Curated annotation (Swiss-Prot):
Catalysis performed (reactions): ATP-dependent cleavage of peptide bonds with broad specificity
The protein's name: ATP-dependent protease subunit HslV
Sorted UniProt keywords: Allosteric enzyme, Cytoplasm, Hydrolase, Metal-binding, Protease, Sodium, Stress response, Threonine protease
Enzyme Commission number: 3.4.25.2
Natural source organism: Leptospira borgpetersenii
Class of enzymatic activity (EC top level): hydrolase
UniProt cross-references to HAMAP family, sorted A to Z: HslV (MF_00248)
Keyword Metal-binding listed: yes
Length: 180
């Protein structure tokens, strides 16, 4: 019997020299079949001041995007407050707890990973990644961050290409957004 689990994505966020960039690949796989190559998993929120990306179930992620956007509006664009409140609601709401997705959100000052278990994680070094190829992208980004003069955008581009060459659930159709 074929496996129908949907697997997808690598999302990488890098903050460097006052700039933040977030990138995501476009592949969506079901079992061992590529279903889509050009999915857009990166969004701008709050008049372009907040970047977000998701890994996991697309339907679940869009639900979380909507909830997060409401929190951002409710808390006047405060990224940290919105992230904490979304995680709290996600963890305690019976229906939301069943959603299978992870979010990375970032603005000009902060970046967070938000999970359904109530985790809100801010990276120590300005680099954070999620998804099936997240560990590959994270390793590449940390090496480039520490040992090159590349910009945040260039680090995301290079690291996502590396992840796409290693992870079978990640492709090289990259969507990239940045805040300068």
């Amino acid at each position: 019997m074929p496996e129908n689990k949907i697997r997808s994505t690598t999302i990488l966020c890098v903050r460097k020299s006052g700039k933040v960039a977030i990138g995501g690949d476009g592949q969506v796989s079901m079992g061992n079949t590529v279903m889509k190559n050009t999915a857009k998993k990166i969004r701008r929120l709050y008049d372009g001041k907040i970047l977000s990306g998701f890994a996991g179930s697309a339907a679940d992620a869009f639900t979380l995007f909507e909830l997060f956007e409401k929190k951002v509006q409710e808390f006047g664009g405060s990224l940290s407050r919105s992230a904490v409140e979304l995680a709290r609601e996600w963890r305690t709401d019976r229906m939301l707890r069943k959603l299978e997705a992870l979010l990375i959100v970032a603005d000009k000052e902060e970046s967070f990973l938000i999970s359904g278990t109530g985790d809100v994680i801010s990276p120590d070094e300005g680099v954070i990644a999620i998804g099936s190829g997240g560990s590959y992208a994270l390793a590449a980004a940390k090496a480039l961050y520490d040992h090159t003069d590349l910009s945040a955008r260039e680090i995301v581009e290079s690291s996502m290409k590396i992840a796409a060459n290693i992870c079978i659930y990640t492709n090289d159709h990259i969507t990239l957004e940045e805040i300068l």
